[in-house]
Amino acid sequence: MSMLSPEKPSEPAKIIDGKGIARALTDQVGREVAKFVEQGNTIPGLAVVLVGNDPASEVYVKNKAIQTHRVGMRSFMHMLPQSTSQDELLDLIAQLNANPKIHGILVQLPLPAQIDPVAVTNAIAPHKDVDGLGEVNAGRLSLGIDGIVPCTPLGCLMLLQSVHKDMTGMHAVVIGASNLVGKPMAQLLLKENCTVTVAHIHTRNTKELAREADILVVATGKSELVRGDWIKPGATVIDVGITRVPAENGKTRLVGDVAFDEAFPIAGHITPVPGGVGPMTIACLLHNTLQAARATQAVADASS
């Protein structure tokens, strides 16, 4: 079989409906929040902090607030100026850590140059770190201990589980080794008993590795990096990337890290961009916030 002309499966890929799966998860969270509150527990609260005035981030943060209210949670938005110092942000996080009405804290990335994102994520109390990026939750994940899992990798895993009930022994290749997606994704796949390969910017044979993948997760931020001849016939492809690129008539369009039109005839299952991984990220944020509220309540019940 030629590497340049991969054998095609008998039919095109099935689209993994991220919107539909995210909607079902959000609806489930809403029902569970209502039940949690009916039992006399505090309404779960999510605080989102945005530093700066990036329009895209503002839209994203406001969308999170809308979804938070939709499932019956409290939303606390903190919009800080671009000039905010690291100490000022850390002071706010300390206040949010101490606030019993807040069960989850998310600081929108990226942050201005004067603020160290590692210091900020580690300042969030581990039981309120609903993005799962602090060193405590990252350490728990690497050790296979239950903790809060980063939203995007968790969403990717749920999409994979909608296709594969058992991933034991499957070869999973993750392209991209970021702390945000690639590394935690690899840990989650290991927990599913996959054989995991991680490719990164210094990997010399990324294309060849991708061609061996039963499961291919791509999170590089490089638009349409993965072409059709990178895909193993019948593979499941999860495209985490999203980039706005020029289109005809002076317009723009959104594309992923995978050349969808080329991959679609080859893959067995594939996520679209948009409408694949993106909706799952916010749904998993709400899921994590409810889990954090439950954990906080369990500690309170045990100590009373």
From Swiss-Prot:
Which CDD domains is this protein grouped with? NAD_bind_m-THF_DH_Cyclohyd
Residues bound to NADP(+): 176-178, 201, 242
InterPro entries, alphabetically?
Aminoacid_DH-like_N_sf, NAD(P)-bd_dom_sf, THF_DH/CycHdrlase, THF_DH/CycHdrlase_cat_dom, THF_DH/CycHdrlase_CS, THF_DH/CycHdrlase_NAD-bd_dom
Q: Which SUPFAM superfamilies match?
A: Aminoacid dehydrogenase-like, N-terminal domain (SSF53223), NAD(P)-binding Rossmann-fold domains (SSF51735)
PROSITE patterns from the UniProt entry: THF_DHG_CYH_1, THF_DHG_CYH_2
Q: In which pathway does it act?
A: One-carbon metabolism; tetrahydrofolate interconversion
Name the protein family.
Answer: Belongs to the tetrahydrofolate dehydrogenase/cyclohydrolase family.
Q: Quaternary form?
A: Homodimer.
Specify the protein name. Answer: Bifunctional protein FolD
Lineage, top ranks: Bacteria, Pseudomonadati, Pseudomonadota, Alphaproteobacteria, Acetobacterales
